[in-house]
Amino acid sequence: MVLAAIFFGGTPILATAMAYPLAICAACVITSIIGTFFVKLGTNNSIMGALYKGLIVTGALSILGLGAATSFTIGWGSIGTVGGIEVRGGNLFVCGLIGLVVTALIVVITEYYTGTNKRPVNSIAQASVTGHGTNVIQGLAVSLESTALPAIVIVGGIIATYQLAGLFGTAIAVTAMLGLAGMIVALDAFGPVTDNAGGIAEMSHLSP
């Protein structure tokens, strides 16, 4: 909203440009609420799978909500220029999509580097066999490696959105990312709970 006031101040589009981020957030909040109803256990009884199902549904519905917010606020045509770059409603919609894609990629990367059946965690476990020193070294190496892909994804998203609609496009992408915060926080909160519960059940030799 602040950037909208800076870039479009004194123009007829000011009010709608300031309302656009609010419309995106409102749409994503509604889609997050709807997504919670899809968090149900499947035939494999995977709790994390149920949470990811809700996240996928929320993301898919957020695309529709983003399109609706764009259509009913600023439209799909040109709304002005930002830093010499023409800003169009369609470009802002694409910026929002990029924000959602960046969020999805970060979730996938996080799952890869923290999953117990993936190479990074298994390599740390294997290094533990030879002692504490190799465990610490391998853990540090994996932790440093794990920051590379998210950084590349975020930088790529920033460059793409800036080329499409300047700083305002980057702000819209960030707004779309924050629109999924409800489901992301739910994953962060319940993920460790399910992992710990699974570990306790395994050490107790309980049936699946």
UniProtKB/Swiss-Prot annotation:
Transmembrane domains' residue ranges: 19-39, 54-74, 89-109, 140-160, 167-187
Quaternary assembly: Homodimer.
Entry function: Proton pump that utilizes the energy of pyrophosphate hydrolysis as the driving force for proton movement across the membrane. Generates a proton motive force.
Name of the gene this protein is made from: hppA2
Cell membrane is among the record's keywords: yes
Catalysed reactions listed for this entry: diphosphate + H2O + H(+)(in) = 2 phosphate + 2 H(+)(out)
InterPro entries: PPase-energised_H-pump (IPR004131)
GO annotation, cellular component aspect: plasma membrane
Family, per entry: Belongs to the H(+)-translocating pyrophosphatase (TC 3.A.10) family.
Organism: Mycoplana dimorpha
Cofactor: Mg(2+)
Protein's recorded name: Pyrophosphate-energized proton pump 2
EC numbers: 7.1.3.1
Protein's cellular compartments: Cell inner membrane
Molecular function in Gene Ontology: diphosphate hydrolysis-driven proton transmembrane transporter activity; inorganic diphosphate phosphatase activity
Chief localization: membrane
Membrane-related topology note: Multi-pass membrane protein
PANTHER family tied to this protein: K(+)-INSENSITIVE PYROPHOSPHATE-ENERGIZED PROTON PUMP
Pfam families: H_PPase (PF03030)
Assigned keywords, A-Z: Cell inner membrane, Cell membrane, Hydrogen ion transport, Ion transport, Magnesium, Membrane, Translocase, Transmembrane, Transmembrane helix, Transport
